[in-house]
Amino acid sequence: MVDDRLRLTSLVARQYTIRGQIIELRNKSLHYVQKDPDKATALTAKLAQWWNDVEDFHDTEDDQHASAYHRAVLTILKHESIISLNRPTLAASRQGHAYDAALQQCIGSARAIITTLHKAIKPRHQREPTSDALALLWPSCTWAVWISTFILFHAASSHHVSDGIVSRFVELGLHCEQG
C-alpha cells in the first residue's frame, strides 16, 4: 500500500507507465497490432483500473491533497490515453465494429478533454487560487485540444456527430487556447 501522502504521485506514475505501454504497442506495425488485440484489451483494463483508483482517491479523505488542478490533470491524462490507444484503429480503416467502438471512445474522450480544460481555464476573476497552476501546464494541453478537435471534425465528416456539436466544442476549444 502506498503512503497516503504519496498516493497522488503514485497515481500519476502508474498512468505514465500505462501511457508508455500504449506508446510501445501503438508504435509497432499495424499488422502486428491487429494480430495481438489481447494486449490492447489488457491496456484498456489497466487504464480502467487506474481510473477506478483515481475515483477511489477522490472519494476518500486523501482527496484533500488533490486540488481542482490535480483533478483536471488526471482527467486529461485519462482521456489522452484513451485517444492514444484507439487512434491507430481510426487510421487503419473506416469499417467494422472495432472502428466504430474506437471512434465512439475517442469522441467521448475528445469532448471530455475540451470540457475539462474549458472549466479549468476561466477568466481570471472566476478562478480559484490553485487553478493558476494550470497555466503552467497549458502548453502541453495544446496537443490535447488539437487532437480532440481533429477527432470531432473526423467524426462529423463521417456523420457520427452533428455539425452543431462540433461547432460548439470547437468554440470551447478556441476559448481554451485563448486561455
PLM feature spans:
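Eukaryote-biased recognition of C-terminal alpha-helical segments
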Residues: 172-179
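Helix-capping and short linker residues that terminate individual alpha-solenoid repeat units
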Residues: 51-55, 59, 118-119, 178
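Extended, leucine-rich alpha-helical cores of fungal transcription factors
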Residues: 1-49, 62-170
